[in-house]
């Protein structure tokens, strides 16, 4: 399990496959379509967002770790995909995170200290 978290590009690809094979089919089943805009809180390298971008969605990823955000930008650019990635605390994001019909939190909620505010 440690290797899976130290090889960030492999982890990116693993997350991408999870979204492609599970999240997107489930979302299509439940709401009938993929929303046009997707926000991921705690996006890391953005792997979960890649299949949404490939499907034509506007994607935004937010993570408190600036290194992960830089990796997200790099991994998306290498795959010729568009995405907006912001290194900040979700509570500092304010207006940029409004009007997203779909918000993902994959292995993140337990790291948010002020859950009441969230």
Question: Predicted segment positions?
Answer:
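Conserved N-terminal segment of class I S-adenosyl-L-methionine
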Residues: 1-98, 102, 106
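A short His-aromatic
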Residues: 107-111
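A short, conserved alpha-helix within the catalytic core of class I
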Residues: 112-118
